[in-house]
Amino acid sequence: EYPIASYRNQFGTVFQDFQLFSETVAENIMVKRPLSGQQRKDAETALQKADMLERINDLPNKMDTLVGREFAPDGAVFSGGETQKLAIARAIAKDAPVLILDEPSSALDPIAENKMFETIFDSFRDKTVIYILHRLSSATFADRIYLLENGQIAEQGTHSELIAQNGKYADMFHKQAEKYIS
């Protein structure tokens, strides 16, 4: 049996309902306080990779700005897309061997979404990344795709293989693609 803390440390997660804490930006990224000098550098690196460092550096106290207005009237409030980028920064900073993402780009525009997936796959190149999504254009980044139907694997393969099979995945992909071109 493994200690539960060791088990949990193996996973980084980004869920749709990601929550920010009423702490500083840096503490939100590292989920720890007080922060050492190295942890502050790690938070800054993660924010850079998540395309949020410029936004954070525009805040009055940069990474030391409190998030939310519960305890500070001048606390930072972030949009849905910015919150998702902060969630990605937290996952990058954790640097776990397995990353699980549930609709990590639902609040991002297509350009930001593409950049986010490039960042994720660059940062987690030698690790396992599992992501759940409905916007299939993002699935093209995956080494392996599993289409689930009624809790069962209905189709599996690479994007190219699934398109060639001309099954449900291909049908859904083409229907979504039509929305972008029409």
Please name every model-derived segment.
Residues 53-86, 95, 179-182:
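ABC-fold ATPase nucleotide-binding domain signature/coupling loops
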Residues 8, 26-73, 117-118, 126, ...:
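ABC ATPase nucleotide-binding domain helical subdomain, centered on the C-loop/LSGGQ "ABC signature"
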Residues 99-103:
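Catalytic Walker B motif of ABC-type/P-loop ATPase nucleotide-binding domains
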Residues 113-125, 137:
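Helical segment within the ABC ATPase nucleotide-binding domain
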Residues 96-97, 127:
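A residue-level structural signal marking coil residues immediately N-terminal to beta-strands
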Residues 88, 116, 132:
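Hydrophobic anchor residue at the start of the ABC signature
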Residues 61-62, 118, 140-182:
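C-terminal portion of ABC ATPase nucleotide-binding domains
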